[in-house]
């Protein structure tokens, strides 16, 4: 890939388009902008631009297109697969200043936002207006465009679906700087190919998202959680298909193991309600009446006890809610704090294979003498599994990491699983995407990329590009 290097003349031209105080070069660019949350892939942009409008993005994309300069878009940088890392230098568009909630439409139940709005800010805003944005990824400081770019899911996906199900419309800037609208406030659309849905999950490789119209729901009046301990992960995960069949529909079904809970206790400095069992499922129920919620959780509680659960804890006090949900929210950071370096397997498998897959990771950890803690969304089969470096030397770490990842993704494929449930492919997981889908499937993806971005300027060498 032969791109133009950014020169002094380019910087001067860019500062004619964007105020100089929002254009950064060289040592002005902080180290954080060279990597994402996981930090295993590093590369600096040649110029960092903090954009504030669709029009500014359009101006920069036109300039980049005319001068053959690659462009990477970054939000909060909370990704885990290197998707926002500028492998070829070039321009980085940083969108966190585009953080306005533009409109709340209470008749159509939509909210229109700029790309840099944080998930936690969006959730707080709509809930203050008695409305509800269901997608609930664990990283609440992620931007909404980052969520859209990976089709993030989160804990509530088992009942409410994922980000794609809540994107009604997008404003995007194409590689050549053209601005187009995709979708809108409409509920139904059979008008040709759904370009909006191609953009969702494309990880910044097709265009730049500058505005989103999101679907909302009325806020449920009541929520309640259950924490249910089991003797082992096979029993805990094995109960999930039976819960789904029981006709009680939990908002969330999370699984967690004792060791991960202990990491969170150490990290947060406070105790979990119970950490004596080897495995747990955490369920949430919501609804508009106390009777509805109680009927559902009693059905599930009785089912779990009949299937070997050791107890059922109702998470109904402020103290217990804080203890349980702060721990669940801290699992990733707690595991990260327990080791010197780590990498993640964001695999998704059918619900009835979760227990087998986790048991496989236990056996793999023992065989390879590495720590492989995990947690995840049992309700939708999306597992978050971490290979920890600890005290391994660089050579041993690289060898063991590669082997562990290869074997886990290969096992997932035998279970009819896929490489990523919600964190995306980015740079780090490309070969596993190829293993899952094969060359013909990836050639179709590459053709879509070529149509949107004929000069291959947007986030090159990511997702389907080997």
Curated annotation (Swiss-Prot):
Annotated thermal dependence: Optimum temperature is between 20 and 30 degrees Celsius.
Keywords for the protein's UniProt record, in alphabetical order: Cytoplasm, FAD, Flavoprotein, NAD, Oxidoreductase
EC number: 1.1.1.436
Cellular component terms (Gene Ontology): cytoplasm
Activity: how regulated: Activity is stimulated by divalent cations. Highest stimulation is observed with Ca(2+).
Subcellular location: Cytoplasm
Main location: cytoplasm
Domain FAD-binding PCMH-type: residue ranges: 41-219
UniProt catalytic activity: lactate + 2 reduced [2Fe-2S]-[ferredoxin] + 2 NAD(+) = 2 oxidized [2Fe-2S]-[ferredoxin] + pyruvate + 2 NADH
Pfam families from the UniProt entry: FAD-oxidase_C, FAD_binding_4
Subunit structure, interactors included: Part of the stable heterotrimeric lactate dehydrogenase-Etf complex, which is formed by the lactate dehydrogenase LctD and the electron-transferring flavoprotein (Etf) alpha (LctC) and beta (LctB) subunits.
Family recorded in the similarity comment: Belongs to the FAD-binding oxidoreductase/transferase type 4 family.
UniProt-recorded name of the protein: Lactate dehydrogenase (NAD(+),ferredoxin) subunit LctD
Native source organism of the sequence: Acetobacterium woodii (strain ATCC 29683 / DSM 1030 / JCM 2381 / KCTC 1655 / WB1)
